[in-house]
Amino acid sequence: MRSVGALLVVVGLVGPAPPLAGAQSGLAGSKQTGTQTASGPAGPTQTSSQFRVCADPENMPFSNDKGEGFENKIAALIAKDFGAAPTYIWWGQRRGFIRNTMNATLKEGRCDFVMGVPDKYDLVATTRPYYRSTYVFVYPKGRGLSIRSLDDKVLKKLKIGVHLLGDDYNNPPPVHELGKRGVVDNVVGFNTFYSAENPPSAIIDAVAKGTIDVALVWGPIAGYFAKQQRVPLELVPIPSVKGDLPFAFDIAMGVKRGNAALHARLTAVLDRRQAEIERILRDHGVPLLQPASGVR
């Protein structure tokens, strides 16, 4: 989640959560663009024809500056419901993402809301979750593998790929659990920094090519890039284990604390558009779980 986490402690920030949307970019600075042309700062969404979204310009499958990510599609759906035009403020999703965007020391902040934050993330006011996903095993179909648990003894014999998250190379929750089981020497780390296009895809490419036998990956990343492979891949949710680190997360939208009006409007839109949102998620290969806290 570049933190690949866009949930590590924040989806992508630090610690074992999933990715804030999904990754942590090495990009710095920001640029603001509308649906077609650049524009200056907009006022609050409630009174503006613009709908300001802070997002990462190079963080597929979540978002990019071409509007191809599932968060781009969902943001466009919400903006349409508001009768507004989506306007993006691009900022690399890394440490300080919320501080430098929504909570920037500007009168209105840089944007009105962000996508893809963990439910109840304390730097913002979160909406009800609009989806729930999980870390998954990814391995080729038809090669005799049937991994359903981190306790499967075959994991000690396979080459396992994992994402290393964030600037300090934090590991996602399943990797902590592998370590507890003594599965260490056969684990290969893949970084998520953007020195090349779509770096999170490298781990899925490696599974398809046979460079590694199985990968443990955040579901939205795994599902999206697995769909692009010629080799059919199996995605199996990693079941929870006893401990402090969950593998599945509820994902919400975040608005600036105190903006009750926008929070209420977003909640109403989510209620109206949940079926369409789920179609977008499924179209992008996101593995969806039953909600834990309020997805309808």
Question: Model-flagged regions — what are they?
Answer:
Residues 5-16:
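Bacterial N-terminal signal peptides
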Residues 22, 38-43, 85, 166-184, ...:
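Ligand-binding clefts/hinges and TM-proximal coupling segments of bilobed small-molecule sensing domains
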Residues 15-36:
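Signal peptide processing junction and immediate N-terminal pro/mature segment
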Residues 84-85, 103-116, 158-159, 202-203, ...:
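Alpha-to-beta junction loops
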Residues 57-60, 65-81, 137-199, 220-221:
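Bilobed "Venus flytrap"/periplasmic-binding protein-like clamshell domains
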Residues 56-59, 132-136, 144, 227-270, ...:
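Periplasmic-binding protein-like
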Residues 38-117, 121-122, 193-197, 283-284:
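Extracytoplasmic small-molecule ligand-binding "clamshell" domains
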Residues 28, 76, 85-155, 165-168, ...:
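Acidic, polar ligand-binding/catalytic clefts
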